[in-house]
Amino acid sequence: MAREYKIEDYRNFGIMAHIDAGKTTTTERILYYTGKSHKIGEVHDGAATMDWMEQEQERGITITSAATTTFWKGRDGKMRRFNIIDTPGHVDFTIEVERSLRVLDGAIALLDANAGVEPQTETVWRQAEKYNVPRMIFCNKMDKTGADFYRSVEMIKTRLGATAVVMQLPIGAESDFKGVIDLVEMNALIWRDESLGAQWDVVEIPEDLKAKAEEYREKLIETVVEIDEAAMEAYLEGNMPDNDKIRELVRRGTIDVKFHPMFCGTAFKNKGVQPLLDAVVDYLPSPLDIPAIKGIDFKTEADIERHADDAEPLSMLAFKIMNDPFVGSLTFARIYSGKLEKGSSVLNTVKDKRERVGRMLQMHSNSREDIEEAFAGDIVALAGLKETTTGDTLCDPLKPVILERMEFPEPVIQIAIEPKSKGDQEKMGLALNRLAAEDPSFRVKTDQESGQTIIAGMGELHLDIIVDRMRREFKVEANVGAPQVAYRETITRQTEEDYTHKKQTGGTGQFARVKIIFEPNPEGEDFKFESKIVGGSVPKEYIPGVQKGIESVLSSGPLAGFPMLGVKATLIDGAFHDVDSSVLAFEIASRACFREAAKKAGAQLLEPMMKVEVVTPEDYVGDVIGDLNSRRGQIQGQETRGIAVVISANVPLANMFKYVDNLRSMSQGRAQYTMTFDHYAPVPSNVATEIQAKYSGQK
């Protein structure tokens, strides 16, 4: 089967934003206008096509990224293939955003025209910066009370430090929003309300907006000619670029992430969506426009690149595992190079296991079509993979490569969970393991002392939804404990410890002596190990045992048994015995050595500090600040945003449970907040004593 669409006609993009900026509605409109959805789904009646898990339809938020393939005819009359990923905007699900950005070529960042740049907008923007994803901006909800396009443009500069290139100006705002001015063509598009947004009239720019349109077109040209010397020279000599040249320069600057073209409209009222789709074709990259994917040779560890080309060896990245009620486990993968055929065998280079592709599916939200072959640039769902997890590389077994892996955040909250009936114990274990395979930011472990099952995640909502999915998808009812904070421990001063491990029973004994300096790691929260052994006092082959021994006890600190962060260990001396020494003996010695040293190294308890932003009407500012202070919060600042005030604070996670209920009653339901993990900080001594007493009793 030959490729149906040329790779330069592909656009792989996602839609990213703050919760409630209208992502799912915008995606719905895109699917409607590109002919994939016959009935427009509204989020508030629970019918949106992309939100296909039951919980999403109930809560009106998008939880998992659903991948959809659809098609659009550009301004040149040529059909393009769109692979769209809908991403969640709730902070508990930033992992979903992160993994979809990793496999996309471009993105549309959505803003709520009333709120502008919100806290979660900043979070997803930073994630997109990390992967250098070209972005366009769509200022949505222009029909909303308080909508202010120009303030949103300013906030992109002040809050994101980014350059927005304004491509359209709104005609009217709030309930008077009628259409947009196209600053390239210099005409106005007015939508016909009765046509569900399918039709619009191209008219002259309204008289009262002509001067503003001229001013913004001038700004647009000034910004885009800066990226091209010849265009800049021509412009300085008084020669304006023509419309095609402007589009070409906007495309180049967008793909090079120099600036971000900005559009406006209202997806809910069906205005502005089609020009946005034309802009996806005009300005977002095809797989050929982005740098080749980097990886390392599976055998030699040499750096290699794979290009978006069907003729190159197959390489793809598994970016999501999903449980499908009809097909079972589905692995979503982005093909970077080569071709994939149904039934073929691929190598998982991370696990060093071969996998057979049973079925290959093209997904449209939650409907699917079987395909026989897929090509470079495609995003496909694969059935039948047994060993593959998120972030694994799948490739041609004869040309193995390991692509750059994704980074996943550590969970900050945990709860104990048990099945309501004894018979469900096994089913619960199976369900939790399945859900953990789907979501790398969700962990399951068994508490060694109590035997309880502990689940950990990114927030209360995250764990609520896990428990809910267990009930719905796996029919397991569970009791959950109160949320527990994922505390950590560290050391605060340097100490030197000399420890000898000797064991003599009949036959071969055990002997190992180690002298180690332990100190806080100046480079961050990871564990760092160094050996400064000279002269062979500890033979080379035993040194990994020393490191392994220390690492094995870092999972349980001396104060209350929490994992330890930010420790550096330097092996400076030791001794061995020709017969009685072994890797195991050195492992045991270093383990005991660290346990002794940790008592003297000023162990300290750390707690997760959350970055909290509260958006509240002015009347409640005093109450909100007072309440945050009472939660040991540190107020970082406040700013006015329209008629609301935004309060930023760092607050310990331990004091933020059920905050949403307090905030609601304090503000009569008018204030909102977002919370993301910021850093670990020392716990004040009076609080630390309580925590130690509580947890030491459990250990």
UniProtKB/Swiss-Prot annotation:
GO molecular function: GTP binding; GTPase activity; translation elongation factor activity
Subcellular localization(s) per the UniProt record: Cytoplasm
Binding site for GTP: 17-24, 86-90, 140-143
Primary localization class, coarse: cytoplasm
Gene3D superfamilies: 3.30.230.10, 3.30.70.240, Elongation Factor G (Translational Gtpase), domain 3, P-loop containing nucleotide triphosphate hydrolases, Translation factors
Keywords: Cytoplasm, Elongation factor, GTP-binding, Nucleotide-binding, Protein biosynthesis
Signal peptide location: none
Any one GO CC term of the record: cytoplasm
Record-annotated membrane-spanning stretches: none
HAMAP family, per database record: EF_G_EF_2_B
Described function: Catalyzes the GTP-dependent ribosomal translocation step during translation elongation. During this step, the ribosome changes from the pre-translocational (PRE) to the post-translocational (POST) state as the newly formed A-site-bound peptidyl-tRNA and P-site-bound deacylated tRNA move to the P and E sites, respectively. Catalyzes the coordinated movement of the two tRNA molecules, the mRNA and conformational changes in the ribosome.
Protein name stated in the entry: Elongation factor G
Protein source organism: Rhizobium etli (strain CIAT 652)
Gene: fusA
